[in-house]
Amino acid sequence: MNIFLLILSIIGILLALFLGLLLYRVFLRYSTEIDSPNGISSLEEIRLGGVKQWIFIRGIDQNNPVLVILHGGPGAPIPGISSARKLDKELIKYFTVVHWDQRGTGKSYNREIPVESLNLDRFVEDLSELIEFLRLRFSTQKVFIVAHSGGTLIGLRTACKYPEKIHAYVGIAQQLNIYEQERVSYDFILKEAIKTGDVSKQEAIKAIGLPPYDSYKKINEKAKYIDSYRGFVYNQPLKVMGTLVTNFLTSPEYSLKEGINTLRNKGYSFTQNAMWEEIKNIKLNKEIQSIKVPIYFFEGKYDMTVPTVLVEEFFDQLVAEKGKKLIIFENSAHFPMLEEKKRYEELLIDVVLKGGS
């Protein structure tokens, strides 16, 4: 009888949690409605490169400049469609913000997507097609691009290939050279483990070994040590990670299945398995010497996932015809747009959009 009551109690708790989740999704949808005569809040399925993909467009005035946000990974929709309602409250006053869950991940996850189409050239063309779609839709010549982490590989290459379509490019935690990135972060975590005298961590880190790695899973193993030394999230880590994780389940734009699949890293694994051989050999710092659009780098001082020192070196050598700025977020690691959200918004509005200093 006691076991029966326990089972009933567990079922009751699970049902209550499920109901609470559904109610919160309804609350979030209505509390973030855009009440503006020329506003837009539209979840849309479009075809890019022949593959169905999802975008979420939000803004209080469709005459505002268009800003496309590229999530990380590739294959990790952070910040993706699921983040839009919570993260863009200020930005939608000044931009028409477009979140895109890239092919193979988040709301655009589909195992039927041809594996051979998961490559950077195809992602660049997907983005180019998306920009064309938005230029026609909103009668604008150029759009702003804001990319984070793995999304910066796509964003920077697109800005170099199609400068005529892009008003300005912002790279947050800009990836450039995966081998160098992993070498610097490996040295960091090993030195921290030695500094703290943690022998077991030292042995575990040495077992991972130096790059190059034959699988993205080695990077995942390293990530937990980077995180433990605050090189992933420096400022309010529990709050930041809690927000990112819960977004997948609470977003009205995601079905529960889509949210759970994302939390289980289905899209990330699918994409990384297909792209790892290409990604591990990327050397944008050697490939790109100049750029024809205004370019900004937003870098967390303590970021050891994508070490800021590598971006500083690239910034110094980059020839930027229309100007370049490197902005360090003094209280952030890999997620300055979350760790110092207010400053991030102010910089996008006052510096990138309005051309301030």
Regions inferred by a protein language model and the residue ranges of each:
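Conserved acidic catalytic loop of the alpha/beta-hydrolase fold
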Residues: 122-142
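The serine-hydrolase catalytic nucleophile loop
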Residues: 77-87
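Alpha/beta-hydrolase
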Residues: 196-286, 293
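Conserved alpha/beta-hydrolase
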Residues: 90-109
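Short beta-strand/loop motif that positions the catalytic acidic residue
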Residues: 291, 297-299, 303
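A catalytic-pocket lid/entrance helix-loop region that shapes and gates access to the active site
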Residues: 166-212
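Catalytic histidine-centered segment of alpha/beta-hydrolase-like enzymes
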Residues: 332-341, 345
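Conserved hydrolase catalytic core segment
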Residues: 140-183
